[in-house]
Amino acid sequence: MAIRKIGIASRCDRPEVLQMVRDIIAHFYSKVQIYVSTATADVLDIEGTPVERMRDKGVELIISVGGDGTVLRNIAKMKDPLPVLGINMGTLGFLVDVEPEDAIETIEEVLYGFSYLERMRVDVFLNGEMLETATNEVAVMSAKPAKIIQFEVYVNDCLLDEMRADGVVFATPTGSTAYAMSAGGPIINPRVNAIVVVPVAPFKLSARPWVIPSDSEITVKLSDHKKEAVIAIDGQKSYRIRPDDVVKLKKSKYPARFVRISDTCFYERVQRKLS
């Protein structure tokens, strides 16, 4: 086989997910060397390897068993993400293409070689210090539920807009079908190098989504010096920001990588997922 080492990382709170991991290990342990993430391994009572160390072990791809959130968590652990193959054990999943009944057969095919798609990510900085890298989106929201915040958004030091809203979402093309879409933003083909800026429940009719070049530097500043806000990154981690803080977003030099398993066009795939 072309692939000799694979990683497996999964949700750990659902029996059917853990059983799928067991089935994959049982089927492939004699064919390839398998590294199981520490969290999953602890539940299965086997030896584990942190996802962030799998590249050092020579792992060539990671099989993520769960939903989109599982994929995002695994990617976030890697500075330079390995290719990911998602097994869909959730509900609606844009980042997980393989259904459970097709998992073993699909992995068999992938082990003989695969291609992958690169998707841009966004580095998030707070007062000059890097926090995380987002694959889907960065949301700046009020720290208090049902309270609006006032903030300014700059693109390359040019004022894009000053908004009063529940918040604002900055999404990659990959994330344009997630929170940004629910907030009224456009769906962006991943081949388009862009970042979507989507106000969330803005308090003025002229506030509209923007699509800006991916090489732009985006700056967010709170205008109301009495209110704090929260940055949520891919719905996984959050950080509180204060009125004097400066948030900056830049395109990351390390893309996410997703194993390509079909030639279905992007538009047909989105229609199928949303139908």
Swiss-Prot record:
Signal peptide: none annotated. It comes from Methanosarcina acetivorans (strain ATCC 35395 / DSM 2834 / JCM 12185 / C2A). The keyword ATP-binding applies. GO terms for cellular component: cytoplasm. Involved in the regulation of the intracellular balance of NAD and NADP, and is a key enzyme in the biosynthesis of NADP. Catalyzes specifically the phosphorylation on 2'-hydroxyl of the adenosine moiety of NAD to yield NADP. GO terms for molecular function: ATP binding; metal ion binding; NAD+ kinase activity. It comes from the Archaea. The active site is at 68 (proton acceptor). Its EC number is 2.7.1.23. This is NAD kinase. Keywords: ATP-binding, Cytoplasm, Kinase, NAD, NADP, Nucleotide-binding, Transferase. Its cofactor is a divalent metal cation. One of its GO terms (biological process) is NADP biosynthetic process. Gene3D superfamilies: Probable inorganic polyphosphate/atp-NAD kinase, domain 1, Probable inorganic polyphosphate/atp-NAD kinase, domain 2. NAD(+) binds at residues 68-69, 73, 136-137, 147, 164, 166, 177-182, 201, 236. InterPro entries: ATP-NAD_kinase_N (IPR017438), ATP-NAD_kinase_PpnK-typ_C (IPR017437), NAD/diacylglycerol_kinase_sf (IPR016064), NADK (IPR002504). It is an enzyme of class 2 (transferase). Belongs to the NAD kinase family. The keyword Nucleotide-binding applies. It is found in: Cytoplasm. It catalyses: NAD(+) + ATP = ADP + NADP(+) + H(+). Pfam families: NAD_kinase, NAD_kinase_C.
